[in-house]
């Protein structure tokens, strides 16, 4: 009597039974993985929901199916389990602002970015998507001189010139009795500024009638794909190989990214390949990525396209949204607007209300407005985990093994009642008081992250905030149009926060809409 082999048994099975057997074996495999993650995993001692830690399934449901709502489930976990929780099988989230700078550490500690968070937009050659600590430090070093506070002195006249163009556009809208979105016009401003820094010239997005352009539309569309891209990073890579017409039929949002990359290539490749020198101080593109002292593999077209995509996204939408949110809070808190204008009125009279950045930074109330606007705009609130590679970390009684992804969302830091009493309120005075009492509150403003991977554009963003708010808030009177606090509601965390969709109104973008009702003081010069 012979014993049949497994192959012979499968060969004799009906195809339906074979598929059923394979499905059962796969289910058994998944159950074993879930059992391991819950009871045998090195992080099994960290509190958390068993449903969350068994695998990526709960996170996938809330992030992909519910379009970015896992952050609120994490909030519930913290309420139930405490300040440290496992949010999936491999990542720990901590809700304790005092531990923020341990996670997002500065200095030489080797801290990688979590590889699971960088694949969404398929920009692997960008500095922001660089996982390895040492490679990131090298790539950032190539760009640092072009985004330092000192280098902004050369960019300041360009920012002022673009703000003057913005003020002229506001006058046109006033004359036409238009309703405009502050998000739109501020996006055009910030896109022109970042292009000036990256290419050495801007493309006058402020002249576009409705302020819809590829950078802005691309960012808004692609945030809807962000979480799906995290779970299926090769999806974007594969789809990008298809003809653009087909991509637009399947995923219009991805087509916007392709158009934007084509625009970067058209605007930058010729300049990049023809120069290949470090002589240009105006363009980070030519000056940094064209420097012959940089290794050749870091001076490629792929690097240009990926770096350009991230720069335009990050340098446009986060700052423009912060400007719009700050103006919303000034308009809904008229006493704050009155105090700000009174402080600005103490400055010497100048054409178009132009003052140097150094002068504006010395004004305590304006500084409070800028920082409070940043706090309540939040910036990116999705988790951006860091991975300490060579050392175990200790949080209270819990040892966290080296190689474990750790995160803390900006949302929890900016709403920490111990740091910010009445965190839902717009109170510029809290920053003045903190400065007078030598409280390092600015350490806990985390829109730009902290540590060795802090946003390289932080100084430029602050410059745009100071220069723009000081002139726009002083020059014109605005009325909000069909815009309430509900438009700032945070329902979906798709990189940045988005409110619930309101059909026929904001389409889930939460844009700040206004009507210009007059000039505040003297006529603005053309």
Swiss-Prot record:
Compartment annotation: Membrane
UniProt enzyme class: oxidoreductase
Glycosylation sites per record: 125, 447, 520
Keyword presence, Oxidoreductase: yes
Organism, as annotated: Stachybotrys chartarum (strain CBS 109288 / IBT 7711)
Molecular function GO labels: heme binding; iron ion binding; monooxygenase activity; oxidoreductase activity, acting on paired donors, with incorporation or reduction of molecular oxygen
Free-text function comment from the UniProt entry: Cytochrome P450 monooxygenase; part of the satratoxin SC2 cluster involved in the biosynthesis of satratoxins, trichothecene mycotoxins that are associated with human food poisonings. Satratoxins are suggested to be made by products of multiple gene clusters (SC1, SC2 and SC3) that encode 21 proteins in all, including polyketide synthases, acetyltransferases, and other enzymes expected to modify the trichothecene skeleton. SC1 encodes 10 proteins, SAT1 to SAT10.
Membrane topology category: Single-pass membrane protein
EC number(s) stated in the UniProt entry for this protein: 1.-.-.-
Record-linked PROSITE patterns: CYTOCHROME_P450
Other facts noted in the record for this chain: Trichothecenes are sesquiterpenoid toxins that act by inhibiting protein biosynthesis.
Gene: SAT11
Transmembrane segments: 18-38
GO cellular component term of the entry, any: membrane
Keyword Transmembrane appears in the UniProt entry: yes
A Pfam family recorded for this sequence: p450
Family statement: Belongs to the cytochrome P450 family.
Superkingdom to which the source organism belongs: Eukaryota
Protein name from the UniProt record: Cytochrome P450 monooxygenase SAT11
InterPro entries: Cyt_P450, Cyt_P450_CS, Cyt_P450_E_grp-I, Cyt_P450_sf, Cytochrome_P450_monoxygenase
Keywords: Glycoprotein, Heme, Iron, Membrane, Metal-binding, Monooxygenase, Oxidoreductase, Transmembrane, Transmembrane helix
Cofactor: heme
Pathway: Mycotoxin biosynthesis
Binding positions for heme per the UniProt entry: 455
CDD domains in the cross-refs: CYP58-like
């Amino acid at each position: 009597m012979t014993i049949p082999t497994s192959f012979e048994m499968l060969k004799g099975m009906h195809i339906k039974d074979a598929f059923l057997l394979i499905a059962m074996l796969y289910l058994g495999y998944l159950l074993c993985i879930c059992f391991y993650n819950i009871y045998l995993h090195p992080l099994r001692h960290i509190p958390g929901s068993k449903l969350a830690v068994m695998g990526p399934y709960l996170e996938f449901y809330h992030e992909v199916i519910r379009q970015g709502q896992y952050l609120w489930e994490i909030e519930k976990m913290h309420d139930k389990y405490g300040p440290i929780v496992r949010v999936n099988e491999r990542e720990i989230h901590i809700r304790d602002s005092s531990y923020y700078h341990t996670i997002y550490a500065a200095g030489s500690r080797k801290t990688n970015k979590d590889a699971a968070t960088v694949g969404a937009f398929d920009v692997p050659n960008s500095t922001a998507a660089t996982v390895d600590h040492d490679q990131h430090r090298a790539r950032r070093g190539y760009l640092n001189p072009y985004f330092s506070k000192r280098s902004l002195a050369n960019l300041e006249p360009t920012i002022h010139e673009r703000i003057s163009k913005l003020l002229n556009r506001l006058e046109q809208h006033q004359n036409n009795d238009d309703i405009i979105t502050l998000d739109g016009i501020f996006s055009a401003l910030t896109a022109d500024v970042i292009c000036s820094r990256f290419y050495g010239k801007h493309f006058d997005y402020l002249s576009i009638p409705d302020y819809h352009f590829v950078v802005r539309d691309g960012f808004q569309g692609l945030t809807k794909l962000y979480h799906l891209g995290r779970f299926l990073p090769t999806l974007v890579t594969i789809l990008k190989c298809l003809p653009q017409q087909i991509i637009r039929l399947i995923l219009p949002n991805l087509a916007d990214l392709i158009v934007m990359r084509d625009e970067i290539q058209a605007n930058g490749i010729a300049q990049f390949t023809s120069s290949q020198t470090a002589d240009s101080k105006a363009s980070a593109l030519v000056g940094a990525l064209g420097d012959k002292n940089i290794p050749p593999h870091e001076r490629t077209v792929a690097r240009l396209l990926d770096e350009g995509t991230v720069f335009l996204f990050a340098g446009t939408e986060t700052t423009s949204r912060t400007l719009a949110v700050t103006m919303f809070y000034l308009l809904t808190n008229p006493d704050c607007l009155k105090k700000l204008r009174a402080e600005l009125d103490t400055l010497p009279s100048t054409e178009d209300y132009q003052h140097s950045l150094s002068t504006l930074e010395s004004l305590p109330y304006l500084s409070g407005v800028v920082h409070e606007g940043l706090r309540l705009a939040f910036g990116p609130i999705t988790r951006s985990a860091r991975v300490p590679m060579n050392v175990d970390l200790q949080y209270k009684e819990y040892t966290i093994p080296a190689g474990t992804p750790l995160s803390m969302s900006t949302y929890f830091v900016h709403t920490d009642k111990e740091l910010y009493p009445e965190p839902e309120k717009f109170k510029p005075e809290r920053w003045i008081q903190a400065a007078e009492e030598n409280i390092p509150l600015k350490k806990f403003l985390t829109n730009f992250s902290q540590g060795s991977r802090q946003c390289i554009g932080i100084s430029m963003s602050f410059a745009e905030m100071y220069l723009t708010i000081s002139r726009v808030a002083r020059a014109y009177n605005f009325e909000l149009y069909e815009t309430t606090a509900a438009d700032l509601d945070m329902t979906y965390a798709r990189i940045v926060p988005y409110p619930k969709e309101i059909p026929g109104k904001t389409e889930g973008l939460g844009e700040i809409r206004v009507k210009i009702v007059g000039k505040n003081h003297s006529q603005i010069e053309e």
